[in-house]
Amino acid sequence: MTRYGFIAMTGIALLAGLGLGTAIARQAAPAAPAAPAAPVPYFVGNRLGMPINPAADGAFNAMSNNVKVYGSVYSAESCSYDPVRRVIVVPNRGVAQNVRTNDAWITFLNHDGSVHTSRWIGVQNPGDQRNMTPPLVLNEPLGSDIINGTLYLADRDGGTGPNDPAVSVVRTFNMQTGAPGRAFRVEKSTGFNDIEVADDGTIYATQTGVGGQTPDPTTWQVWKITPDGNASIFVQGAPLRQPNGIAFDPQGNIVVVNIGTEDVITFSKDGKVVRTEKAVQSGNDGLVIMRDGTKYVSSVVNGGVSRIRSGRNAELIAQNIPNPASMCYDSDENQLVIPMNANNALAFIKL
């Protein structure tokens, strides 16, 4: 009896096990893949308030005016001032291309550095940017400029790994709507640093290139991109030495600062050297030129801001700023605004 009882119980256990296994198998069956979300119209983020993203009915309530918010800047390398909105426009690079692509966004700041709009362009969650009409692509912008209602950004594609070469792309956005416009892709450039844009849409862009112990002068370049997209090298090699900041002087000449020297070099529109001035420090990045020709130069390596006035020696007006990068000029407040790269902050200097 004991023997038969054992067999009977074993049979019950086997049947139960088979039933449980069937149930688990049913539960583990993969669900049918969800249908991809339908594309949504392109949108940008609201200024501080609620909701953050635009509501379908357009409803929005601004943040109360007794609140100030600071921050929203991450790995910013440049800024531009928008005199129409009266805000400082800051491109945030986000994480590097080899971590996640399409991670950049644009912040608007008020004159005192407080946040106006935390994320204007790039408010979407990662991956959602491409599901808009038109899609948003903004990878790792460095230099920036605003001309005739258009935001120009020195961006890049590629660089996600050792077998994915970086390629320079200048992307444009409408300053009223935030919608993407044209993209100027320059296959022969590995990465633009700063840009300056003429009223007719001609773009001048620096490629800093290779310095250090094994410098490569062929990589020190200034490019010119015509409004129809034709790209050519404007200047290459010496007297450039890792060119960085670029701007126009009041005569329409092209002025470039070097990282590798103190030189501030003025080129004519045909690429000839007009003059060479000296900043107080080398390692220069930012360049602002005033209407009277006064130049301000920031050294991302040595932390100072030089002022260069015609017929006078350069002088430091600020010192020991951590990594002051590509400056912009806030004309309404007569101040320099200087992003500080990995310090995730901006410096403000009243003039």
Sequence positions of predicted segments:
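Bacterial N-terminal signal peptides
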Residues: M9-G17
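Blade/loop signatures of beta-propeller domains
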Residues: P39-M63
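A short beta-strand motif characteristic of beta-propeller blades
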Residues: M63-Y70, V115-P134, A179-R185, N230-Q236, ...
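Beta-rich, blade/repeat-based domains predominating
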Residues: S72-R86, T101-D103, V123-T150, R182, ...
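Beta-propeller domains
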Residues: V90-S118
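Short glycine/acidic-enriched loop and turn motifs that connect beta-strands
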Residues: G94-N98, G158-P162, V210-T214, T261-D263, ...
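A short loop-to-beta-strand structural motif that recurs across blades of beta-propeller domains
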Residues: N102-T107, S168-R171, W220-W223, D263-I265, ...
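Short loop/turn segments that connect beta-strands within beta-propeller blades
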Residues: L109-S114, N174-G178, I225-G229, S268-K272, ...
